[in-house]
Amino acid sequence: MSRRKTREPKEENVLGPTVREGEFVFGVAHIFASFNDTFIHVTDLSGRETLVRITGGMKVKADRDESSPYAAMLAAQDVAQRCKELGITALHIKLRATGGNKTKTPGPGAQSALRALARSGMKIGRIEDVTPVPTDSTRRKGGRRGRRL
């Protein structure tokens, strides 16, 4: 009779950097909140390497709900879970609205995405607004007399 082959214990591959206990590993969460969708894009500190990118539209079925706070919250929870798998424990936040010659106000998903990241156990470092501001832009849409309601 042949003996059963026993599996040899494999070394566990740990994703992410090796750190001491109680030390934070930072990533950068770029949150782009327009009025049509909310993007949460986590990179390393240099911004070159994408670790995870999830949008509100990936979490809900209806197009009208892509920019909703609920979709942003679901996306942020997914992002936080993936970050923890990769060993990221803290995030710097870069919040961006559409900007340019369009609105400089972040969309409805911005605040709920930030809250969901904080509530899911991620430590928040710096919060920065990186909305592009025109120095002297092309002409804004709406015509000479502006948008009439």
Swiss-Prot record:
Report the coiled-coil segments: none
Q: Where is the signal peptide?
A: none
**Where in this protein does the record put region Disordered?**
130-149
A single Gene Ontology CC annotation of this entry is: cytosolic small ribosomal subunit
The terms under GO molecular function for this entry are:
structural constituent of ribosome
* GO biological process terms held by the UniProt record: ribosomal small subunit assembly; translation
- Source organism, top-level taxon: Eukaryota
Tell me which UniProt keywords the record has, alphabetically. Ribonucleoprotein, Ribosomal protein
| Segments of skewed composition (Basic residues) | 140-149
The answer to whether the entry has keyword Disulfide bond is: no
Q: Which cysteines are joined by disulfide bonds?
A: none
Q: What family does the entry list?
A: Belongs to the universal ribosomal protein uS11 family.
Q: What is the name of the protein in this document?
A: Small ribosomal subunit protein uS11z
